[in-house]
Structure formats: C-alpha cells, structure tokens
C-alpha cells in the first residue's frame, strides 16, 4: 500500500511547509522528507474542545468541531449524531464526543484498504500496543453509507505463522471501544479516551490537567500530534490495498 509498494511503513515524517492554518485541522505524514503523503492524522470534537472558542477569539474557525462534523457527514448514516464504539460487551453502546482519524491517502489505497491486513503499533507512557480490525473472514456484519464497517481492537495479524489473526480486546480496561475501520474509505477512526487509557501518554495536556488530550478553549491544541507521536513511537504501520479488476473475454468462431 505504501510508496514503493512496501507493506510496512516505519518512517513517519511531517513537513515544516504545511501551513499553520491547515495544521489546526490535520497533519500530513510522509514516508521521508520530500516524499509522498502516506496518510493524514486529525482530531475532531463535536463541541469544539481543543480549539480556540469564539469567546476567546471571534475569528476562530473551531477546527476540531469542523473536523468532527466533516467525518460525521462522510462516514455516519443519516440520523447518527455521534461516533459510537463498544461499551463493555455492547457494540455501539458508547457515544464519543471526540475522535482521532487516520485517513490514508487515496493514491495509496486506490480502491480500498484490505480488511484484515493492516496493523499499527501505538506507543505511549505505558507500553506499545498493536491494533488491527476484527474483519476475520473479510466480510462485515455492518454496512453503512460509507461501506463496510469493522471494529478496531488490540491484537496481532500473526504474520509469518499459520495462525489466523487474533483479537486480544475490543475495549480498554474501562470497557470503552477502541474504534472503527472503514476499508472502502481508507479511514480508521479511533476513540482517544480508550487509546490513551491503554497506551498512556506523557504529553502536556494543557489546562485540562490529567487528560490525554488538550480539551481547553484558549489555544489550538492540535491534538492529532498525540496520535502522530504514538504511531511514530510504535514504528510500524502495515497495510495492504485491494482492487477488483474486471476483464472481458471474447470468443471468435472461425
């Protein structure tokens, strides 16, 4: 999937030339300096936490609120107001006000990402954890306007062995789901609360002391950098793409 037709990405570079304004919404990640964009990371909050409020700056664009609304419009079905993840054993039982986004560049995944064949290691102050989807048999029980939907869990693809992929858990220690995977869109949506409950974080959380992400309203938090650092620290993002290629056969009788 990645540039050079490699299946594993181990170098994660951001660009100093990306505009400051766009960094309030997302961060492009490259395979090398002056390389190709591999994916973008973003943070969204339904009510705009993590961005400067209009009370503090009447020219604020409420970047985190706009990002949440953008992906809600792209991925959620009509009538769904929030992203939903596991709550204990109940699928979609937890409504999340905030989300992390990994949006793979279209030039990389082309038609769709290969469900069951991606993994990303996230590193934090606790330790490193590997995350995959729970597709297993390559089909999904859940299909929405954005196509197939799978849950994200900690686990292993067990590459190099005869074993199938294994899911260790779909939830954190408090019972909150890790995220969703939309292979037809090349998008992974993660639950920041569950992710940081598991991997931890040592990043300054600003005015919201003790939190995993900055939830204040006096400055632009650019919380997507927390996710970027977790991916960079993990040092391995594996993924494949898949395409349906149509062929036509003509039989000529002489």
Whereabouts are the PLM-identified features?
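Long, position-biased, composition-driven segments near the start of the mature protein
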Residues: 1-254
